[in-house]
Amino acid sequence: MSENNNDKITVKKTLTLKRSVLETSTVKQNFSHGRTKAVVVETKRRKITRTDEKAETSQPITKPHVAPQRSKPRFEEAKPSESSMAKSNLSSAEMEARLRALEEAHIQERITREKVEEQARRIKEREESLRQAVQETEIHQEEQKEEKNPPVQTSPLSSAHSSIEPIDIAITPKNITVTEKRKADEIKNDDRHSRRANPAKSEVRTPKVVKGANERRRGKLTLNSALDEEGSVRGRSMAAMRRRQEKFKRAQNQEPKEKISREVVIPETITIQELAQRMAERSVDVIKFLMKQEQMMKPGDVIDADVAELIAVEFGHTVKRVLESDVEEGIFNIADNPQKMQPRPPVVTIMGHVDHGKTSLLDAIRKANVVSGEAGGITQHIGAYQVEQNGQKITFIDTPGHAAFTAMRARGARVTDIAVLVVAADDSVMPQTVESINHAKAAGVPIIVAINKIDKPAADAQKVRTELLQHEVFVETMGGETLEVEVSAKTGQNLVKLLEAILLQAELLDLKADPKRTAEGVVIEAKLDRGRGSVATVLVQKGTLHPSDIIVAGNEWGRVRALIDDHGRHVKEAVPSTPIEILGMQGTPQAGDRFAVVTHEAKAREIAEYRQRLARDKAVARQTGSRSSLEQMMTKLQTTGIKEFPLIVKGDVQGSIEAIASALEKLGNEEVRARIVHSGAGGITESDISLAEASNSAVIGFNVRANKQACALAKTQGIEIRYYNIIYDLVDDIKAAMSGLLSPEQRETFLGNAEILEVFNITKIGKVAGCRVIEGKIERGAGVRLIRDNIVIHEGKLKTLKRFKDEVNEVQSGQECGIAFENYEDIRAGDTIEIFRIEHINRTL
């Protein structure tokens, strides 16, 4: 029996660790610094032995499948049973040495794998592929080594006594936790001491690691890996990568959009955001462009038209510059068609002194009593009426006669065709009569003199004609061209003759207008009526005005609701030279404002807003004194090219005024002269200030002062009043102001000549002529002429004047020097340089 048993024992197979009894699963762990480790969890099954093997086997230790937990798993060593220890005759020291060898091999393999992964991470483009390739290469090399080196076999002596069972150890190179690392380090240290004591002892090789089925799903995201990878960063999914590739392909295949060039309308000022919207660009792009130009701005900042044009051109757009005043283009001064012109009635203005019978004369002409309705017999507003004589119509405008309404009288003179100057035969020429003459002459309209109150016993028509000669009004009976008619508003004497004289003068003027075009005219007066609202009396000068027309008058606009004539009747249209009342204005315009018909309300509103804004700016300018000095007025006249110096002179007596006027007339020459717009004896009144504002004149007071109302009006209008009590001081100041209008005189002074001896080229300076002064002297900064063969080829200024390498101010005759010209280098030896100086001398009268 013993022999048979021994025979069976001798033929047993070599001791091996069979891997077929293990079911493996892989769990990936992440550590700091980008390191990862795959841990294999193995489940041991029952080992099945062959029937011919009578050796007693120990029950296999089954380790349950360990699911990945967030807590660190505990490491349990698989210890052999006492029976197997007794049968294998292995001491505990040998078993511990074998375990330590296995752990050391595992740790060494992990260290090697980490080094390989560290090297693979440094390669950016193929990080993951290279790391997997290195791992596969290492595993393949280990398999080849195991094929060459078979597993360690037990000695024949130990196998003869007992059969050794395979030891199933649930430890693999990939299931070591942090606790296992500490134990492995302790085992490694103990093994080093044991190796020193037993250097001849053979080492046990690490069993080969076999890739399980789960290794193929290493890069997949599973529930176990998601629970185990705490704190790890999840990578991009395949769907995200696929979307990214599709987006990149679309961007590659998409054709670039063609730049669209637009016409950008740029006003005087515009915000960056509005400019970007008009260019169809982003505000950020415009701000980036400004940042490149070293301008830090925001979308809401306002820039001027020049900067806006630069930005628009830089972005590839065309620019159309517009001004705020462009909104008024196309409403005034439209050219009339000569073929459509038709005769129109003349517009006649009744002018004259207060209480000389202007309204009474007009009332006699109209055959209607309007005098009784006036306060104190004085006309308080401009009345416009139309009468008919021999089938021809005449439009009359009655202006107030007293001095407080000088500005209204000036507006009336601007709209009239013929001025009828009413002078009382018993009162002769008065101050307001002279003002009316001046207004008529300034407007350039012909004058017809109506000598009224001829029926009175004290009437002296010849005296009136003689006094009119002093104001340059020459009537026909005195050898002039001005028509005069002796009339009586009370008795109606010669009224028909006056109307015939007006029609005769109108025939000479050949007055025509186009009634088919849009209406245009002037506001005669405006008022606010409690029942009807704003009511404006206008004079149609061109075209025909209809109800429902949209008009702009000064700073106001409105739609015509009704047209009322001078008899209070509603009419359907107003032809040229027709005075008419209009209802429907949004506000009350000023007397003298021009009106015109526009196409739609938006344009009318835009024009009115622009004019209101302009009026506010002018009011601010007056308060700051923009026109408050005589010097600024002189500068304005000089820039506009006007050579006349307008003045309004008021004195204490008529003799002083005549002396001042005579002295001022002597100051003029062929370039500039003084023009006295108005002069008179007495204090400075509101009428004088209004006339100065209308004619842009200076106000001079000689031994007189302005009253309180005139001072307030002058301050409001920004008119300066100068007072004098010595006639010579007055003349000297006016002379100095008028002298400023004269252009200065240029006088040339010869300094010397120099001859060019040699020409030198000097760095950073250019050509320098070495000269000798042969006549006079050379001064620094003087003018020079280059003469070659007695021909002047260049005239300019000196750039450099040196003597012995030093800058000098002048060089005397007989000395040598170096000369360089400004922006000119065509100089040759033998040329002659002429030096001169130009002096500007102010001219005086």
Swiss-Prot record:
Query: Among the entry's GO cellular component annotations, what is one?
Result: cytosol
Report residue spans for region: G3: 398-401
Quick one: signal sequence residues? none
Superkingdom as given in the UniProt entry: Bacteria
Q: Which segments carry the region annotation G1?
A: 352-359
Which segments carry the region annotation Disordered?
A: 45-91, 127-209
Q: Where in the cell is it found?
A: Cytoplasm
| Record GO terms (molecular function) | GTP binding; GTPase activity; guanosine tetraphosphate binding; translation initiation factor activity
* Segments for region (G2): 377-381
Which residue stretches belong to region G4?
452-455
Q: Where is the composition biased (Polar residues)?
A: 81-91, 151-162
Give me the ranges of the annotated region G5. 488-490
Binding residues for GTP: 352-359, 398-402, 452-455
Keyword list, A-Z: Cytoplasm, GTP-binding, Initiation factor, Nucleotide-binding, Protein biosynthesis
Which InterPro entries is this protein grouped with? Answer: EF-G-like_DII, EFTu-like_2, IF2_assoc_dom_bac, IF2_II, IF2_N, P-loop_NTPase, Small_GTP-bd, T_Tr_GTP-bd_dom
Q: Which HAMAP family match?
A: IF_2_B
Which family, according to UniProt? Belongs to the TRAFAC class translation factor GTPase superfamily. Classic translation factor GTPase family. IF-2 subfamily.
Stated role: One of the essential components for the initiation of protein synthesis. Protects formylmethionyl-tRNA from spontaneous hydrolysis and promotes its binding to the 30S ribosomal subunits. Also involved in the hydrolysis of GTP during the formation of the 70S ribosomal complex.
Question: Under which name does UniProt file this protein?
Answer: Translation initiation factor IF-2
What is the taxonomic lineage of the source species?
Bacteria, Pseudomonadati, Pseudomonadota, Alphaproteobacteria, Hyphomicrobiales
